[in-house]
């Protein structure tokens, strides 16, 4: 897949295409197909649940962004997090949203156009091989569960920024939430590589792997849990 350059405030942020590997192409195709099909519904759901459990605000707070910073969101989807990220960096900062799914990006671009944001850009690219060279902060919400190599992916994100915040579902401890998550993963078995075996155990393993990557690459990692413990936010910080 070829990544597209992102334009912000008259300048260009260099983006590079990921290595061409059959496994990566197959995974990317599954993600594009699944999320592209449900883009409109996902857009509504993401905005309707923006404030549930304080997850979104907690993620942004954990990034510790300052006015003028550059923040990249991998798996930005229809742009539900863009408003709070832009507010955090101010008009002098930059927000870059990266997603692999065209219909999602079209909805995000519509949001940016309606708001008239000149310092928010969007790039189509694969988050597993980050198409952005550097930033002050990186955010990814409910993304790493899609990656069989979540440890390596998050490690590459840590190469791009000194602050990396990852939010994931934690399929343990709450029966109703686990049942809903199990059902969603089963319906989208190809998306989660979950055609066989214990899908909840697989999701838990990928959440653990993303946290382990932060532990290995960052100086400190803070973990908080939300919504009856079903959502985990891990914030990695590299001391300057």
Set out the residue ranges of the language-model regions.
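Conserved class I S-adenosyl-L-methionine
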Residues: 5, 9-64, 80-84, 107, ...
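A short SAM/SAH-binding and catalytic strip from SAM-dependent methyltransferases
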Residues: 137-150
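A short glycine-rich, Lys/Arg-flanked "PGG" loop and its adjoining helix->strand segment in the class I
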Residues: 152-163
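Class I SAM-dependent methyltransferase SAM/SAH-binding core
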Residues: 72-129
